[in-house]
Amino acid sequence: MSDNWTSEELEAAVEAYLEMRRKFLDGEDFRRVDYYRALADRFPRSTKSFEYRMQNISYVFALMGRRWIKGLAPLTHVGSKVASQIEAIINKREGRPPSQIAEFSSSVSNYQKKKKRLPPEGNRTPPKTKTGGSQFVRDPGVVAWVLDLANGFCECCNKEAPFQISMEHPTWK
């Protein structure tokens, strides 16, 4: 068994998560372990592996600003590449447009975890991306650096800054 998850394994895990989430939001009863067992029967991974992966999926939902399944608290140990894959699968399954919220947030978090780092170079002419309007593409290294310098406080008014999210790490909002 490879440590790396195949796209088929990730898609099956996200599909199971979305079904559980629908039941959770509708107030229907379900047993998470039944889903883990069904997945473990299909793929060469343990039920515990699928439980952890479901918590990674909760983390991606939280990064996207969406509600996750109670009892599957977000587990932040997921790389930005896998977070991006999970986000893409969620968006595809739900018919949503592609986004890179989870990948960017995960990259910021990874930069913040580095013990010693120099100020990032940044980009004096950042590229723009088209959405409903235009916005600059942010450098996750710069965002992480600024968040660390701010230390939870607004640089303009010195009040506690409003960029905290519920998973104990800041976001760039």
Could you describe each region identified by the protein language model?
Residues 1, 80-122:
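Defense-system signaling and execution modules centered on TIR/cGAS-STING-like, death/scaffold domains
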Residues 4-30:
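Eukaryotic helical DNA- and histone-tail-recognition domains of regulatory proteins
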Residues 62-81:
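Short Lys/Arg-enriched helix C-cap and helix-to-coil transition segments
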Residues 108-171:
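Short, charged surface segments at domain edges that flank catalytic/cofactor-binding sites
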